[in-house]
Amino acid sequence: MEQMRVYIANLGKYNEGELVGAWFTPPVDFDEVKEQIGLNDEYEEYAIHDYELPFEIDEYTPIEEINRLCNLAAVSYTHL
């Protein structure tokens, strides 16, 4: 299985015309996301702008769900 990763962007900054985001490898730690892409009281929302995963997600898939699905994919792959 290829490396799974997601590109998470600061949605507030994106809407202001500035691309602030980073690639993360699951399991994604939300505190790390907040620190790396500048989520705070002013910029609270994020969006998934790209991904390399063996399943489909959308831009508003919660990080917890991405982590859960990645765990299932990894477990399934090891049992092949």
Report each predicted region and the residues it spans:
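N-terminal ordered "arm"
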Residues: 1-43
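Conserved small/polar residues in nucleotide/adenosyl-binding loops
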Residues: 78-79
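Polar/charged, Gly/Pro-rich intrinsically disordered segments
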Residues: 74-75
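Short, intrinsically disordered low-complexity segments
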Residues: 38-71
